[in-house]
Amino acid sequence: RRVKEQLKKIGGMEFYDVNFSYIDNDSFEEHYVSVPEQGGGKLIPEGMGKPGSVYTVSKSKTGMIGCYMLETQMMPGNGKLTCTGIGSGKEPKEATNTAFNYLKANGNRISGQISTTTKDYIINYQDMQGIGMTGNLALPTLIAICSAALGKTPLNSLAILGEISIGGTLIKVDELASTLQVCLDSGAKKVLLPITSAGDLGTVPSDLVGAFSLIFYSTAEEAVFKALGVE
């Protein structure tokens, strides 16, 4: 365990596959995200994931674009969200609060089965490339919680792009071409994209656009439904 924790702290690409199975002593059992035969060395593995596990690609606080994994556990409780791995930065913490507050206000528009009063949620955030945490975590956090609460596995090989404000306004993707390139390098085959970014696709090389199934959303609720494969 100590070796794994040290490798995680060192970060960097050469150690990312250690994270396919790891233990968080505070809250988690051992988690297996994928097996090497499935993942083929990609950050976003092929094959079915599990409820509450999602991947997002966005810009870190250092300005670099990276891939981040969220893993969620739900348990009986009184409506508390605990986030591990986000570090001490203000933006990531605010984004996770935005997601939970949005869910409290609008959860019934997604599903009556999602409780923010009788369940607690624990989410572990992983900076897969060791470049620093991103602040764009509200939408991925919302999708991760809904996935865990509904017991629905997200679409496989999916990268979540874009962000939402506390009021649900869509925030388009910065540097779309570079972000999609990181999605491709990370192993994504499907990309969830805000409709507000559609106009920027003209700036992206056509072969890069053609590398994915692009899935557009126009509201936060629609993003949740489409990420979970619910029509």
Predicted segments, located by residue:
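Peripheral, non-AAA+ core regions of ATP-driven protein-machinery
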Residues: 15-31, 35-231
